[in-house]
Amino acid sequence: MSRRLLIILGPTAVGKTDFSVSKALEYGSPVISCDSRQIFRNMSIGTAVPSASQLAAVRHYFIQSVPVTQAYTAGDYELEAVALVERLFDEGHETLVMAGGSMFYIDAVCNGLDNLPDGDSALRAELWERLGKEGVGTLAEELRLKDPLTYSQIDTRNSQRVIRALEVCLVSGRPFSSFKTGERRKRSFEIEKIGLTRPREELYSRINQRVLNMIDEGLVEEVRSLLPYRDCQALQTVGYKEIFEYLDNKIPLEEAVRLIQRNTRHYAKKQLTWWRRDPDIRWIDL
């Protein structure tokens, strides 16, 4: 019996959800979400979770399953997602549909992550608290002193990446980079990757319109309800950081909207740059 994991990937707003639901119905599969933002609860508008009708049509996993206050890593996702995939194959599925745009989550499932030491939740909480008070630059400088190689390789403006690397350094007493082996983990199932794309101007137009739709659907109110948790890992992301700035009276709403649109377009470009290097992806123009 074949055991094929069909991974549908692509930039934000390209149309992965509709495509994945249609494929799931075709193969009698659930949709296994591979999205590092949609996995958190209480963030439905700003992360564009599947609609009620889409969720009703096909069972979805890893949608709003983790509390917004909980730190959750690509390593956590690898363990849980691979275990789920194995179980569903054992139950008789021949093809399973996974869909998402989170590069590190997809890489974790396909190739596995290096065996990092167990995290320290108390230390992680302390680092996130420091982030709120001192800013990511201070933590990045601490990482540079402990692990110059990792500092030179990651986006040091990405607070989540900086904190994860620094946590490993502090827990282990070793540089984060010393745990990187580059070895691919073998899976007991075949992996097929389909990448979705659109002409750039069309994709950017869809992104801009999606942000306007989010505002109409109540994004500001959603972010306001999350103010007590604004320093949590889950909320250090596009669509929330900008609205927090607006709620702090630092920028007008129109500027927050413009920044969300711009930052989302930048993220889409980053996603495509990352995946274009992967020769195993079969691209489909929508």
Language model regions located:
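Phosphate/pyrophosphate-binding catalytic cores of soluble transferases and nucleic-acid-acting enzymes
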Residues: 1-286
